[in-house]
Design a protein with these regions (language model features):
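Conserved catalytic neighborhood of penicillin-recognizing serine enzymes
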Residues: 129-157, 215, 279-285, 400-460, ...
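Active-site beta-strand/loop architecture of penicillin-binding DD-peptidases
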Residues: 294-297, 342-385, 390-394, 465, ...
Length: 784
C-alpha cells in the first residue's frame, strides 16, 4: 500500500476523492451483480512456468517482454550482457521464493488472495486517510490494478489522475481476475514491475542490488526489494541507502501486521544488517568477439529480437583468448617501435567443429589511437603470400602435384592491352625449373603467378569459396593475376578458416562461433551441428599435398633458414604473408586440430618499416602454438581431454608414395643426388598437367612413376621456351621430342630427411612468463 505523502492542491485532492468515490460505487454495483467464474474456479491451472509467463505477458500487452540476453564462453563463463533496454529475467511462479511473495503482498496488496481485483476496503481506507490528512497517503491500488496499468496503459496514461483512467483500470483489473489465476497475475506482476536502476522484475532486482539469484535472497533482502516499486528513485539503495533501509523497516512492519512475521521475528529482522553488492558487469571480455556475436544475433533475430533473454553459448574459450591477447600485446610492445606497427590481431579456430576459440581484434579495444574497436580479424586486408596455398590447392585439384614443375624465369603479361605486369621474387632472382613444393615452400612469386595463369582465375575463385573465403564475390573479370600474390583483400578470419579446412583433410566445416542458443524460457532454439553441415571442399589428397609442403622445414630453408619462428616443437603447417608497401604482415598455420591466424600492422593502413610476416606475425603464431601445447589443461577445447594430441597429418587412403628427383632452388643438377617422396593417387597419372611432351629427361626413382617424376617439360609459350633452352644449355640435359623417349629405369638415390623438430621455445615471452602470466590474466581479468 502507498504510504508516501504528496501535497496536493485542494482542487486536485477533491477530484481524486470524487474518483475514489465513483470507483467505490462502481465496485458496490459490481459486487451485487452475478460474478463471472474465474479461471481458477472453471479450470484450475498449474502455477505458470517462465514460458507461460512470457506467453501471458505477450498475449496481453501485444509484445514480448524484453529480457537480458547473456553471452557465455564455451565453459559457461559470462562474456557480456545485452541489456540496452534494461535488465530483466523472466522466472516462473515456483521459482519465486515465498519470502518474496509474502513481502510483496504485505506491502502492496494484503488482501490479494481474497479480493476480485478491486479491494474496496483499501479504497475506503485510502479515501478516509486522504480526506483526513488533505494529502494522498494511500491510493488503494491492488496488485492486479498495478499489473493492468503496466500491461495495458501507455507510460503517460499510467500517471494520469483522471476518473476515466481510474475506471479503465478497474475494468482491466476485473478482466484479469476473471480470466487468469492469482498465481498467473502475481507471476506477471513480479516479472514486470520496475525496481529502479534498470532492474525490471524481481529476478533482475536481486541481481542488480545483491548480485544474487532469487533462491539466494535472505528475508531481509526480500523485504528491502519489496519496498522499492512504490518509488524506485526515492528509495534507490545506491543513492539513498538510509531511505531504502527505512523503507525496508516499514515493509517488515507490514509483514508483521499481515501475519507473516511474529513480533520477535520482525525485531530480529530489523536488526539484521543488509549489505548491498551491486551487480558487476563482465569486464570487457573478448569485446570484438562479443560484437561479432551480437551482429550474428541481430541477423538471426532482428534488432529487437536480441532483447528476448537468450542464453547464447559460444565456442570461445577465455583461456585461449587470454593467451592470444597476452602474446599479441607483448609482441607489439617488443617490436612495434622497431618496425613501426601498433596493432595485432589473432584468431584461433578448431577445424573439426568450426568453433572460434579466440578472437583478438586488436591489442586494446579502448585505445582510440590504434582504432582499437575495429575488429581486424574481420576487416578485409591484403594477405600477401599467405594466399598462395589457395592457388596451389586449386592446382592440386586439377592434376598438379608438389612434384609438378614450373619455370621460374622472367615473364611479363600485358594487361588491358596496355599495362605490363612483370612479377618478381622478393630476392630479385629467378631460379629456373622448380617443383611446386620448392616454389610454395619458399613463397616465390613468379611460379605462383604462372600457376594461376595456367589453371585460370575462375578455378582459384571457386576453390577459395569452397575453402571458406567469401570476400571475393565480384564478377570474375574484376580479378587479375595479382590474385596469386595477395593483391585482393580477404579478412584474417576467412583466410584462417580456409586453412582450417585444409587442416581438416579438405573437409569444410562452417564457422560455429555459437554452439547453442536458449530462449528466455530455457528452450533450445539453435544447436550447432557441425558434422551435419560439413562438405568435402578439396580432396583429402590435395589437402595432404598442401600440408606436406607447408610443414616442410627443409624445403623452405632458402627463404626461412632455421631457426625461425616457423619452426615449432611439433609438426605444423604454416604460411607467411607480407604485402607491398609493408602494410600488412600475416602468419597462418595449423595442425590437424588447430588453426591460428595472425595479422600485424596499423589499422589506419600506415606502412611499416621493412616488416616481414615471419618476424612480426610469426613469433605470435609460434608462441600461441607452443603455449597451447605446453598446457594440457587446454586440450579439452580441442577435443583431446585425455591429454594426448595427435602428431603429424593423416596420409589419405588409396595413395602411393613415389621418389622423385629433388633439388633446391637455384641448385639444380642433372645427376639428381637425392630424391624426395611425393604422394600420388594409387592410379598414377600418365600425362603432365600442362600437356607438354617436349623437354628433358631426369633420373627416375621408381617404376612405374608419373611423367613429372622423370621429365622436365619445356614451357608452352615461345618466349619462356627460349629462356628455358638457354638455361638448359649450361646443365647438359638430354632433350627429347616426347616424354616417352626418356629412360624410366629406376635409379637408386638416397631420400632426403626432414630436420629434427626443435625443442620448445618462446620468441615473444619466456616460457616461465607464459606459464604464469597467461593463467593469472585469465583468472584475474575474467574472474575464473
Amino acid at each position: 500500500m502507498m504510504d508516501i505523502r504528496f501535497s496536493l492542491h485542494p482542487t486536485l485532492l477533491r477530484a481524486f476523492q470524487r474518483a475514489l468515490a465513483i470507483v467505490l460505487v462502481l465496485g458496490l454495483l459490481l459486487s451485487i451483480s452475478p460474478p463471472r467464474p474465474t479461471q481458477a474456479e472453471s479450470d484450475p491451472a498449474p502455477p505458470p512456468d517462465a514460458a507461460r509467463v512470457i506467453e501471458l505477458i505477450t498475449s496481453l500487452s501485444g509484445e514480448e517482454p524484453f529480457q537480458t540476453t547473456r553471452i557465455y564462453d564455451r565453459r559457461g563463463i559470462l562474456l557480456a550482457d545485452i541489456d540496452d533496454r534494461g535488465r530483466r529475467t523472466i522466472v516462473g511462479y515456483n521459482e519465486i521464493p515465498d519470502i518474496v511473495i509474502q513481502a510483496t503482498i504485505a506491502t502492496e496488496d494484503r488482501r490479494f488472495f481474497q479480493h476480485q481485483g478491486i479491494d474496496y476496503l483499501a479504497i475506503v481506507r485510502a479515501l478516509w486517510q486522504n480526506t483526513q490528512s488533505e494529502t494522498i497517503v494511500s491510493g488503494g491500488s491492488t496488485i492486479t490494478q498495478q499489473l493492468a496499468r503496466i500491461l495495458f496503459l501507455s507510460p503517460s496514461e499510467r500517471y494520469e489522475q483522471s476518473i476515466q483512467r481510474k475506471l479503465k483500470e478497474v475494468e482491466l483489473a476485473q478482466f484479469l481476475e476473471t480470466y487468469y489465476t492469482k498465481e498467473e497475475i502475481l507471476a506477471m506482476y513480479l516479472n514486470m514491475v520496475y525496481y529502479g536502476n534498470q532492474a525490471y522484475g524481481i529476478a533482475a532486482a536481486a541481481e542488480v542490488y545483491f548480485n544474487k539469484s532469487l533462491s539466494e535472497l535472505t528475508l531481509a533482502e526480500a523485504a528491502l526489494l519489496a519496498g522499492l516499486p512504490q518509488a524506485p528513485a526515492m528509495y534507490d539503495p545506491f543513492r539513498y541507502p538510509e531511505r531504502a533501509l527505512e523503507r525496508q523497516r516499514t515493509v517488515i512492519s507490514l509483514m508483521q501486521e499481515a501475519g507473516f512475521l511474529t513480533s520477535s521475528e520482525a525485531d530480529a529482522l530489523r536488526a539484521q544488517p543488509v549489505l548491498f553488492h551491486p551487480y558487476q558487469r563482465p569486464r570487457n571480455r573478448a569485446p570484438h568477439f562479443v560484437n561479432y556475436i551480437r551482429d550474428i544475433l541481430i541477423e538471426r533475430f532482428g534488432t529487437e529480437g536480441i532483447h528476448r533473454g537468450y542464453q547464447v553459448h559460444t565456442s570461445l574459450d577465455l583461456r585461449y583468448q587470454a593467451l592470444a591477447e597476452r602474446i599479441a600485446r607483448a609482441q607489439v610492445k617488443r617490436k612495434g617501435k622497431k618496425y613501426r606497427f601498433s596493432n595485432a590481431a589473432v584468431v584461433i579456430i578448431q577445424p573439426q567443429s568450426g568453433g572460434i576459440l579466440a578472437m583478438v581484434g586488436s591489442i586494446d579495444f579502448n585505445d582510440k589511437k590504434i582504432a582499437g574497436q575495429v575488429n581486424m580479424t574481420t576487416v578485409p586486408r591484403q594477405p600477401g603470400s599467405a594466399i598462395k596455398p589457395i592457388v596451389y590447392a586449386a592446382a592440386f585439384e586439377r592434376g598438379w602435384s608438389p612434384a609438378s614443375i614450373i619455370w621460374d624465369l622472367p615473364v611479363y603479361y600485358t594487361l588491358d592491352g596496355r599495362r605490363r605486369y612483370a612479377p618478381r621474387n622478393i630476392t630479385g632472382r629467378f631460379y629456373g625449373p622448380l617443383r611446386l613444393r620448392m616454389a610454395l615452400a619458399n613463397s616465390l612469386n613468379v611460379p605462383a603467378v604462372k600457376l594461376l595463369q595456367a589453371i585460370g582465375i575462375p578455378a582459384v575463385l571457386e576453390t577459395a569459396e569452397k575453402l571458406g573465403i567469401k570476400a571475393w564475390r565480384q564478377p570474375q573479370d574484376q580479378y587479375g593475376l595479382s590474385l596469386a600474390v595477395g593483391g585482393y583483400e580477404v579478412p584474417l578470419l576467412e583466410l584462417t578458416h580456409a586453412f582450417a579446412t585444409i587442416a581438416n583433410q579438405g573437409v569444410y566445416t562452417p564457422l560455429y562461433p555459437i554452439t547453442e542458443i536458449r530462449d528466455g524460457a530455457g528452450r533450445v532454439v539453435f544447436q550447432a551441428k557441425p558434422r551435419e553441415t560439413q562438405r568435402q571442399a578439396i580432396s583429402p589428397l590435395a589437402a595432404y599435398q598442401l600440408t606436406s609442403i607447408l610443414s616442410d622445414a627443409r624445403a623452405r630453408r632458402m627463404m626461412f633458414p632455421r631457426p625461425s619462428p616457423l619452426d615449432t616443437s611439433q609438426i605444423t603447417a604454416v604460411k607467411t604473408g607480407t604485402t607491398d608497401g609493408w602494410r600488412d604482415n600475416l602468419t597462418v598455420g595449423f595442425t590437424s586440430y588447430l588453426a591460428v591466424g595472425v595479422w600485424i600492422g596499423n589499422t589506419n593502413n600506415k606502412p611499416m618499416r621493412n616488416a616481414v610476416g615471419v618476424y612480426t606475425a610469426g613469433p605470435i603464431w609460434h608462441d600461441v602454438m607452443e603455449a597451447i601445447w605446453a598446457d594440457e589443461s587446454l586440450y579439452d577445447a580441442l577435443g583431446y581431454a585425455d591429454g594426448v594430441l595427435p602428431q603429424g597429418f593423416i596420409l589419405p587412403p588409396d595413395t602411393v608414395t613415389i621418389p622423385v628427383c629433388d633439388w633446391l632452388p637455384g641448385k639444380f643438377t642433372p645427376r639428381c643426388p637425392r630424391m624426395v617422396e611425393e604422394v600420388y593417387p594409387a592410379s598414377l597419372p600418365t600425362s603432365l598437367p600442362t600437356g607438354r611432351d617436349r623437354g628433358y629427361c631426369l633420373p627416375a626413382g621408381a617404376a612405374p612413376s608419373p611423367p613429372e617424376a622423370y621429365f622436365l617439360p619445356l614451357p608452352k609459350d615461345t618466349r619462356s621456351a627460349a629462356a628455358a633452352r638457354n638455361w638448359v644449355r649450361k646443365r647438359f640435359l638430354r632433350a627429347v621430342q616426347h616424354l616417352n623417349d626418356c629412360d624410366t629405369t629406376p635409379n637408386k638415390r638416397p631420400l632426403v630427411k626432414q630436420p629434427k623438430l626443435l625443442p620448445p621455445r618462446q620468441w615473444v615471452l619466456s616460457a616461465e612468463k607464459m606459464k604464469t602470466s597467461v593463467h593469472l590474466q585469465a583468472s584475474n581479468q575474467y574472474g575464473e
